[in-house]
Amino acid sequence: MAKLHRLISAVLRLAAAGAAAAAAIIMVTSHETTSFFGIEMEAKYSYTPSFVFFVVAFAVAFAYSLLALLARPGSTASRLLLLSDVMVGMLLTGAVAATGAISQVGKSGNEHAGWLPICAQVQAYCSHVMGALIAGFVSLLLYFLIIMYSLHAVAEPLCSCH
């Protein structure tokens, strides 16, 4: 049973690492230059702090996911994994939420603040950001599954209901 638990955990962590890496890479490659009423406009992920936060958060999640694979079952480090998984899940939730909010402003603008939508002018850039968000949601969902599976694995020995 321990081998099966380790295998499932490893597969989930590798999938989460892959999705996190994809999210960060897609966001980093989001860049477009266009002309708008004769004015050259450049859209780049590094111009938006929440997008930079997104890249850093998913790079951290990628590295953590790979490091977590090194923890031996039953070791002190493996006991800290659940807490660390929750922390990484919260980090990713914040990154996806911040990026989603700013993306919505880029897509629809904000009439009250006087911010115009930009996605009509830089469609490839906005598509890249959307792709990064989708990969980010997948990674976040996988982290949720990792947390639920880890909770189950921790609680199972405590339950005498078998």
Curated annotation (Swiss-Prot):
One of its GO terms (biological process) is multicellular organism growth. GO terms for cellular component: plasma membrane. Pfam families: CASP_dom (PF04535). It is found in: Cell membrane. The keyword Signal does not apply. The keyword Transmembrane helix applies. The chain crosses the membrane at residues 8-28, 51-71, 80-100, 129-149. It is a multi-pass membrane protein. InterPro entries: CASP/CASPL, CASP_dom, CASPL. Residues 29-50, 101-128 are extracellular. Keywords: Cell membrane, Membrane, Transmembrane, Transmembrane helix. Its main location: membrane. Residues 1-7, 72-79, 150-162 are cytoplasmic. Belongs to the Casparian strip membrane proteins (CASP) family. Homodimer and heterodimers. This is CASP-like protein 1C1.
